[in-house]
Amino acid sequence: MKANVYSMEGEVKEEIELPAIFNEEYRPDLIKRAVISAQTARVQPWGNDPEAGKRTSAKGWGSGRGTARVPRIKNGSKAAFVPMAVGGRRAHPTRAEKNHHEKINIKERRFAIRSAVAATANKELVENRGHRLGDLEQVPIIVEDDICSVKTTKQTREIFQNLGVYDDITRAKEGKRIRAGRGKTRGRKYKKVKGPLLVVGEDNGIKLGARNHAGVDVVTVENLNAELLAPGTHPGRLTIFTKSAVEKLGGLFQ
């Protein structure tokens, strides 16, 4: 498979042969597992206090009193300790020692990344994911390495406009909305839309230049993962590769 390399002005500079990773088999099931594995690896353990509801000297009266044989507090008849009692323990409490991480085999994870990279070259998948492609002739977009040294938002805005992906950044900006439900009070007030992903051979300042654009993520090719390529487990993210990143991809994730 061949692809054009664009300059920062949006003009075709040359044509290169894409590595075999872009022809990998499409496996949405593996991609989903790899993304969920990455998400659950960040989960903070939570659980109830093991002593909750048990801090009492309640003791049962036994039979023969015409009342339920449940533990009752001393100097009174109020039930305690048991799950059905007010202030009693929980029947099956959450436990902090539970491991929430859903693991995945190393070879499967690498296969998932390769498959997600190949999905970025499928125009139909990228469109179905909701990205605005406009007049784009090819996906993924490959740009010259000079972009790695761009350090300002103004410059990156002009480059994205020249490459034809700024409409998708606008979509991400307009898609920010307040979350429904209790999550608003738990540090995740807004739901945000993912825009283009920029994969670079090395970071010489481009992260500073692109971080202020809504929905844009920047990553070096060595740190590429399934969650960046398929946010929310949905493959086909609009992706911009630098030429050096494409060259390095051929020897990674094997």
Curated annotation (Swiss-Prot):
Which Cys pairs are S-S linked? none
Which SUPFAM superfamilies does the record cross-reference, listed alphabetically?
Answer: Ribosomal protein L4
GO MF annotation, one: rRNA binding
Keyword check for Transport, yes or no: no
According to the record, the residues making up region (Disordered) are 45-70
Q: For this chain's UniProt record, which GO biological process terms are given? A: translation
Tell me which UniProt keywords the record has, alphabetically.
Answer: Ribonucleoprotein, Ribosomal protein, RNA-binding, rRNA-binding
Pfam families in the record? Ribosomal_L4 (PF00573)
Q: What is the superkingdom listed in this entry's lineage?
A: Archaea
GO CC, one annotated term: ribonucleoprotein complex
Q: How does it assemble?
A: Part of the 50S ribosomal subunit.
What the record says about family reads: Belongs to the universal ribosomal protein uL4 family.
HAMAP family from the UniProt entry:
Ribosomal_uL4_A
Q: What NCBIfam families has UniProt attached to this entry? A: rpl4p_arch (TIGR03672)
Purpose = One of the primary rRNA binding proteins, this protein initially binds near the 5'-end of the 23S rRNA. It is important during the early stages of 50S assembly. It makes multiple contacts with different domains of the 23S rRNA in the assembled 50S subunit and ribosome. Forms part of the polypeptide exit tunnel.
Q: What is this protein called?
A: Large ribosomal subunit protein uL4
> From which organism does this entry originate?
Methanobrevibacter smithii (strain ATCC 35061 / DSM 861 / OCM 144 / PS)
Gene behind the chain: rpl4
